[in-house]
Amino acid sequence: MQRVIIVGSTGSIGTQAIDFILKNRDSFLVVGLAASTQTSLLREQAQVFGTKNTAQGASEAAELIEATEADVVLNAITGAAGLLSTYATLKTGKRLALANKESLIMGGKYFLDMTSFKGQITPVDSEHSAIAQAMKSGKFSEVNKLILTASGGPFYDRESLEGITLKDALDHPTWNMGPMISINSATMFNKGLEIIEAHLLFGIPYSQIDVVIHPQSIVHSMVEYKDGSVIAQASVADMTLPIGYALSWPNRALNAVRPLEWGARQRWDFLPPTENSMRSINLARRAGEAGGVYPAVLNASNECAVEAFMAGKISFARIIHVTETVFNLYTKQHTNRESAKNPIEVILEEDARTRELAKTVIENMSAD
């Protein structure tokens, strides 16, 4: 039986994980829960599993992880707030089921160096879960490229991004997700972050990581091998499967999702990204290749831009413009440099510095 801590238990991934565990109670024991919002739901979840180990907020979540004996931690917190939970999980030698890609992107090589055993970080993102499964079909040296699939979001065929409302941006065509990742999917920024995540998790150079649009969201990603073979992982669009795979690793999950209906006629399209989406993807590649604190800076820039859009301060069309502007200003003013400080302190300091810069940029744009 695996002892599980879920941080971000009241969010989209957290609640889906709880539903999965309730169907597989013989395999999992929830020993801790943490959330930043919906405290009444958090209390209800704790009662269901009979645990008194609960926490509110990012700092308390990290303390809970350090103080509680567990086999696996599901980090389902949204955004940079998940950094401390990832740090605490790796520091205490627990296995990390990672839905919070932002923390890995921020921590980068530092977090990879903290891992104490193979498979300590198991991805929850459907794309990276698919890659992890497909890479079992060959040796690392035999991999030619990784191909990340993207639904294209709700605006793939739209020429102009002007006039898009918050409701429009949250209406994802295939996935049920939280607001931040839904908007990041709509701008394709999420796919840019996933390129950085794939590079860190699998050690494949950026030049060998491609993106294709697959509107049906059935093929979740692919690995192309040097002999010309392509190994893909396909399933219905349901996050329960990658959640279950990450929690059950190295075994496959039971009672996850229904199989595809192979007797029914299906259409699988694969299309190139649009010029609009490549702006996000290329910006992420640039930050990832630069390394150091730059991926953390990029993430903070985007989080501030998305929050400004959600607050009605900027238009949807300006999200990536703000992200790019803040990132460019930061890189002009600061360079990656060695520091005697704890890397987590450095990351948090530069994250805060970026957010102050973003605040000024957004205020100036709002005044125009």
Swiss-Prot record:
Its cofactor is Mg(2+); Mn(2+). Mn(2+) binds at residues 125, 127, 194. Its EC number is 1.1.1.267. Pathway: Isoprenoid biosynthesis; isopentenyl diphosphate biosynthesis via DXP pathway; isopentenyl diphosphate from 1-deoxy-D-xylulose 5-phosphate: step 1/6. It catalyses: 2-C-methyl-D-erythritol 4-phosphate + NADP(+) = 1-deoxy-D-xylulose 5-phosphate + NADPH + H(+). It comes from the Bacteria. NADPH binds at residues 10-13, 38, 100, 102, 178. SUPFAM superfamilies: 1-deoxy-D-xylulose-5-phosphate reductoisomerase, C-terminal domain, Glyceraldehyde-3-phosphate dehydrogenase-like, C-terminal domain, NAD(P)-binding Rossmann-fold domains. 1-deoxy-D-xylulose 5-phosphate binds at residues 101, 126-127, 151, 172, 185, 190-191, 194. InterPro entries: DXP_reductoisomerase, DXP_reductoisomerase_C, DXP_reductoisomerase_N, DXPR_C, DXPR_C_sf, NAD(P)-bd_dom_sf. It holds the Pfam family DXP_reductoisom. GO terms for molecular function: 1-deoxy-D-xylulose-5-phosphate reductoisomerase activity; manganese ion binding; NADPH binding. Signal peptide: none annotated. Keywords: Isoprene biosynthesis, Manganese, Metal-binding, NADP, Oxidoreductase. GO terms for biological process: isopentenyl diphosphate biosynthetic process, methylerythritol 4-phosphate pathway involved in terpenoid biosynthetic process. Belongs to the DXR family. HAMAP family: DXP_reductoisom. Catalyzes the NADPH-dependent rearrangement and reduction of 1-deoxy-D-xylulose-5-phosphate (DXP) to 2-C-methyl-D-erythritol 4-phosphate (MEP). This is 1-deoxy-D-xylulose 5-phosphate reductoisomerase. The gene is dxr.
